[in-house]
Each structure stands twice: as structure tokens, then as C-alpha cells.
Amino acid sequence: MSVTLHTSHGDIKVEIYCESVPKTAENFLALCGSGYYDKSPFHRVIPKFMAQTGAPATPNPPENPKGGRSIWGGAFEDEIRPALRHGARGVLSMANKGPGTNGSQFFITFDKAPHLDGLNTVFGRVIGDEGLATLAKMEAVEVDRKNRPKEPVRIENVTIHANPLAG
């Protein structure tokens, strides 16, 4: 299963680990398919660490709270798998505020982040040179003291290449 995140800085094709983390994959793919991530900003970019996105472009509580939401409305549990680690550039992982607080936000690593193993659900990885080149462009964006990009970095839209959830 793969999707392409069409961003303001280029395309990022990602493989989603549907069999290893089915609930996280279902949430991510359903949000992709519904257009939820369209225009979603990368609101945190930390060079040598990660870029975070997944909050709605236009928060509209309570349907779209500022921090985002899952397809089930509330938070959902982690799917920590020992074999899935933050061991490379281009790992996709759920952002959270602690155990069982996953919603819509996720991040893509710029480097290894082993301190997140066991804390955040890894659910995919960047595939292909184009996506890695796009990550390099995103990592080079100037940020303020709070790691917010000084120029817009966002997901424009998403293409799902094969959706096992579609009948």
C-alpha cells in the first residue's frame, strides 16, 4: 500500500504498513481519502529530527479541533511493534501526547530517532529518491525559535495508489 503526499516542496511517496499496524493504517488512509490532510501545514520542522503535520488546515471545533482527530472522533491506542523502529530518515510515525492519544497528526523523520521507539507508532516509510529529495528541501526551510517554518510548507493533497479499504 502506498500513497503520495503532494507537498508545497515536492512529492513524497510513502509505503504504509497496513498489516503490521492495521488501526493506524486505517485511520491514516481514511483521512487521506477524505481530503482531511489537504492543505494541512507542516507546523513543526526540526532539522536533523523531523517534520510534523496532520492538523486540519482550518480548525473548526468540535468537528476539527486544532490538534486534529482520528476517524473515530477521539484518540486511539498505540500500535507499538518492536520490529518497527525510528531507525532511519523517512520514517512515518504518529505524533501523540502520551500513550493512547493518537489522532491525525504524524511526523516524518529526517534522521534516526531511537528515543521514540516504544513511544510513537511507526506506520510507514518514504520510498524513492524523489521523496527523500523533498524531505531535504523541507529540512532546509528556515524556522523560527519555536521550529515553525517561516515559509509555508504543507500537504497540498494526497494520492492513494492502492486502497485496501475501498470495496
From Swiss-Prot:
InterPro entries, from UniProt?
A: Cyclophilin-like_dom_sf, Cyclophilin-type_PPIase, Cyclophilin-type_PPIase_CS, Cyclophilin-type_PPIase_dom, Cyclophilin_A-like
EC code(s) of this entry: 5.2.1.8
Domain PPIase cyclophilin-type: from-to ranges:
1-160
Entry coiled-coil feature ranges:
none
This protein's name: Peptidyl-prolyl cis-trans isomerase-like 3
CC per GO annotation: catalytic step 2 spliceosome
The record's section on PANTHER family has: PEPTIDYL-PROLYL CIS-TRANS ISOMERASE-LIKE 3, PEPTIDYL-PROLYL CIS-TRANS ISOMERASE-RELATED
Q: Which GO terms describe its biological process?
A: protein folding
Task: Say if the entry is tagged with keyword Isomerase.
Answer: yes
* Purpose: PPIases accelerate the folding of proteins. It catalyzes the cis-trans isomerization of proline imidic peptide bonds in oligopeptides.
Signal peptide segment:
none
Q: Which family does it belong to?
A: Belongs to the cyclophilin-type PPIase family. PPIL3 subfamily.
